[in-house]
Amino acid sequence: MKAKSMKSIISVPISVSKTGKMKLTASPDNLASMMSKDQNKLIHLDPVPSFEDRHEIKPWLQKIFYPQGIDIVIERSDSSKVTFKCRSVRSKVGLNPKSKGSSSRSHACPFRIRAAYSVRLQKWNVVVMNNIHSHELRFDLITKTDDYKKFKENLRQKNDEKAIKTFDELEYKASLNLPLVTPIISCDCGLTKEIEAFNNIFLPLSNPPLTSKKNLLKTNKNSVSKIKSRQMDNSKPRPRLKTKLDADLHDTGFLDNFKTRNSCVKIEKEDSLTNLNEIDFTNMFCNDNFIQNYNQGLMELLTEPTPGPSSSSCILPSTPTRPLSQSKMDIALSESTTSSPNFMETDAPYGDEIIKVSKDTKSNAPTADTDIATNLGKERNENFGMLNYNYEALLHFNDEHFNELNSIDPALISKY
């Protein structure tokens, strides 16, 4: 993998010094992951053991950098500062043994490590100055140098069995051209970009762009605003027409009764009523109490009518029955008359007496030429309309036709 592609996928621990400056820190165990990319930044090694002598720094650094293929040598040294560099080890295959090595800058590796003693902290500070190499890092070439052989002998003297075992494995892999370190495996799962051996996970160096979060916040705000707008629309009052009729208003069952004034359609105060023609009057004539009372009274007054001839010019069907008694006629007329200004009282001769009859002055009342008898054959729920039509026609008789009252079926007139 190229070095440029590694810059955005490796996590670097950052610490703050006492002077307030940001610095990169890495432990010796995690230094390999820090060194896997090219960068020109200072990498502070922490923790660093307490060295008794400056000569102990080089074996400690060789133990860290040899597995990475870096052969370090001392470039400059004094009592309080030591500078190490990378020795460029090249293969001798195809080279003339008599030719001298070139001392040009193109063959010099810029990799540097600085070790400085801090008088205040009483310890050595080790910093990687430049993590750039101008050559290929190969461990198999390092194993052939004299410094590496001295390093292995020093480990045997210290009885560092763990380090000896590790380097023996590296030598065996290098002899068989096996990879020394498991290569970084690219991951397209979306959770992590790169996964290294020994469960080392690399994360982005810099903070990820906040565009996705901003977009998410914007979408969330939009959705919330839409929900709020919908809730506000639902909470707005809408104009509604409410038709409420009192249950105990119809004593007689007729709309012209003075007690039915309060049964007018009540419309609540709304902002606007667009169409007043859409009022529902279906429940206005549905009065079960009246229908039940009407059926009961009808059974009391009902007599078997005798069929007779009927003419189309007559308003009511002429059914010859017994003459209507004066008491029942007075009850029907007295309870139907009202003090409403829509009615006009007139005197109608009936035999030897004069009866007061109320006439409706409204234009929508049925007349002699209207379809009064159209609902006579309907079901139980329409009996009220039939009776109302017949009685309204009775009230609109002229004085000349009032003698036909004797031919009206008394069953059609309620005793209420």
Curated annotation (Swiss-Prot):
GO terms for cellular component: mitochondrion; nucleus. Keywords: Activator, Iron, Nucleus, Transcription, Transcription regulation. It is found in: Nucleus. GO terms for molecular function: DNA-binding transcription factor activity, RNA polymerase II-specific; iron-sulfur cluster binding; RNA polymerase II cis-regulatory region sequence-specific DNA binding. Dimerization via the binding of Fe(2+) or a [2Fe-2S] cluster decreases the DNA-binding activity. DNA binds at R54, H55, K58, I74, E75, R76, S77, D78, K81, S88, V119, R120, Q157, N159. Zn(2+) 2 binds at C86, C109, H133, H135. A motif (CDC [2Fe-2S] cluster binding motif) lies at residues 187-189. It holds the Pfam family AFT. The keyword Nucleus applies. GO terms for biological process: cardiolipin metabolic process; cellular response to iron ion starvation; intracellular iron ion homeostasis; positive regulation of transcription by RNA polymerase II; regulation of phosphate transmembrane transport. Zn(2+) 1 binds at D53, H55. The CDC motif is involved in iron-sensong via binding to Fe(2+) or [2Fe-2S] cluster, which leads to dimerization and loss of DNA-binding. Homodimer. Dimerization decreases the DNA-binding activity. Transcription factor required for iron homeostasis and resistance to oxidative stress. With AFT1, activates the gene expression in response to low-iron conditions, also called iron regulon. Recognizes the consensus iron-responsive element (Fe-RE) sequence 5'-CACCC-3' in the promoters of target genes. The transcription activation by AFT1 and AFT2 depends on the mitochondrial iron-sulfur protein biosynthesis pathway. In high iron condition, the presence of iron leads to dimerization, which in turn leads to a decrease in DNA affinity. This is Iron-regulated transcriptional activator AFT2.
